[in-house]
Amino acid sequence: MIALIQRVSEAKVVVDGATIGEIDKGLLVLLGVEREDNIEKMQKLATKVMSYRVFSDENGKMNLNLEQAGGSLLVVSQFTLAADTGRGLRPSFSGAGTPDQARELYEAFVDFCKSKGVNTQTGQFAADMKVSLVNDGPVTFNLQV
């Protein structure tokens, strides 16, 4: 399971001209599901995302996690993160989870984060989305479990 996280000062997702998810300070999470992923991996990754210290403390050091910084999550499904780009000029998605598996784990990820008290907004699974953000830093990390 893969989470590309970006520290943002604002981010939103638009589908068919309507904003469906929007946050101010927090993390934009692009979430990719691979074939071997399961609930245990999802919980481990969600915990890591929420606990990862990417926000600045009073000394300007990346020392605060999402809760300590008072941030929110915007979680967007992104199957292209599971692409194999090692050969040729076209990505292979053979390692990506099935649509049903990906939907189940994406929804479980969102529910898990909400259950921990984190303000969690979402995109729309399998939709054509327009994602806009202001990357604060920029700060971007690729987390995998």
Swiss-Prot record:
GO terms for molecular function: D-tyrosyl-tRNA(Tyr) deacylase activity; Gly-tRNA(Ala) deacylase activity; Ser(Gly)-tRNA(Ala) hydrolase activity; tRNA binding. It comes from the Bacteria. This is D-aminoacyl-tRNA deacylase. It comes from Shewanella pealeana (strain ATCC 700345 / ANG-SQ1). The gene is dtd. Its EC number is 3.1.1.96. Belongs to the DTD family. InterPro entries: Daa-tRNA_deacyls_DTD, DTD-like_sf. HAMAP family: Deacylase_Dtd. A motif (Gly-cisPro motif, important for rejection of L-amino acids) lies at residues 137-138. NCBIfam families: D-aminoacyl-tRNA deacylase. A Gly-cisPro motif from one monomer fits into the active site of the other monomer to allow specific chiral rejection of L-amino acids. Homodimer. It is found in: Cytoplasm. One of its GO terms (cellular component) is cytoplasm. Keywords: Cytoplasm, Hydrolase, RNA-binding, tRNA-binding. Pfam families: Tyr_Deacylase. It is an enzyme of class 3 (hydrolase).
